[in-house]
């Protein structure tokens, strides 16, 4: 490669290096988040999941914040010039870039105005998937499964809100867990789909490569979502895997997290109050 070519492609090489570093960091953070409960359970004052303690809840909840910061770091690296601006301490430029990034992300996640007709079109698929998930759970509960597959006596997430008032329980099951889990699980899928749908991607990336990348992200998301529900038994993992497929279809069908959050929230609320 000649000196001229090196100079010409240097910004792209730097950008690729920043993105690679960001994704590597995110992978490491996801790995740490995966083993964090085991590490936290060995610390003084922390009890295993299923026996709640304030310190345990605080430490075990920190893993989600760490992964969220890692995801934000990766997204920041994806914008041209952001890393360089940050390194040079250009706070004003960084704020402008961050605003652009934020708007791009929320647009990719489906943050837009919805008409009553739009919401009405979501009712049947959302309600249908809730019914399907309840039937899947009923089917799994009656299969002759081994000891490791039987349903747990207590769901740690429900134990947390056992002594709460009905409105608090409803808000927790309808908003807190669904929003957090959908942003972490289906959010990356929608963001990748958004990037692959840009004119730049259509000009630069072959169609089959775009499909492979999207399906790979979907597979990782489904497996991760199912793995995050492995706190109790294999039946819960299988149920979460089925749910992840349906939630992914909803998110991609409407290019929005809203129907997935609604389906996830109403399902959680139904299970909690049934």
Predicted segments — roles?
Residues 14-30, 124-129, 218-223:
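Alpha-helical transmembrane segments
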Residues 1-11:
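Short, Lys/Arg-rich, polar N-terminal cytosolic tail immediately upstream
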Residues 33-41, 85, 186-191, 236:
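Short helix-terminus and kink motifs of transmembrane alpha helices
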Residues 56-68:
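Alpha-helical transmembrane segments of polytopic membrane proteins
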Residues 40-58, 83-178, 194-208:
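Juxtamembrane helix-loop-helix connectors linking adjacent transmembrane helices
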Residues 66-77, 257-259:
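Hydrophobic cores of alpha-helical transmembrane segments in multi-pass inner/ER membrane proteins
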Residues 161-274:
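Transmembrane helix-loop-helix hairpins at the membrane interface
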Residues 24-41, 76-77, 133-138:
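Alpha-helical transmembrane segments of multi-pass membrane proteins
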């Amino acid at each position: 490669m000649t000196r001229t070519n090196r100079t010409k492609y240097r910004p792209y090489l730097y950008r690729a290096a920043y993105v690679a570093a960001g994704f590597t960091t995110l992978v490491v953070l996801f790995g740490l988040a995966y083993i964090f409960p085991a590490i936290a359970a060995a610390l003084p004052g922390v009890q295993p999941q299923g026996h709640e303690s304030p310190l345990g809840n605080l430490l075990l909840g920190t893993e989600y914040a760490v992964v969220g910061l890692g995801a934000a770091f990766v997204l920041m690296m994806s914008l041209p010039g952001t890393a360089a601006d940050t390194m040079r301490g250009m706070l004003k430029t960084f704020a402008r870039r961050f605003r652009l990034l934020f708007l791009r992300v929320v647009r990719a996640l489906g943050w837009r105005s919805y008409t009553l007709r739009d919401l009405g079109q979501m009712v049947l698929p959302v309600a249908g998937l809730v019914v399907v998930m309840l039937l899947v759970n009923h089917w799994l509960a009656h299969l002759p499964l081994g000891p490791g597959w039987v349903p747990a006596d207590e769901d740690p997430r429900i134990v947390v809100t056992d002594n709460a008032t009905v409105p608090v329980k409803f808000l927790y099951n309808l908003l807190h867990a669904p929003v957090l889990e959908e942003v972490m699980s289906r959010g990356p899928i929608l963001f990748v789909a958004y990037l692959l749908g840009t004119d730049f991607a259509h000009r630069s990336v072959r169609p089959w490569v775009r499909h492979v990348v999207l399906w790979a992200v979907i597979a990782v998301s489904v497996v991760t979502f199912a793995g995050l529900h492995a706190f109790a038994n294999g039946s819960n993992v299988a149920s979460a895997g089925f749910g992840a497929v349906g939630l992914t279809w909803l998110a991609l069908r409407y290019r929005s997290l809203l129907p997935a959050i609604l389906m996830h929230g109403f399902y959680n609320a139904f299970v909690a109050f049934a």
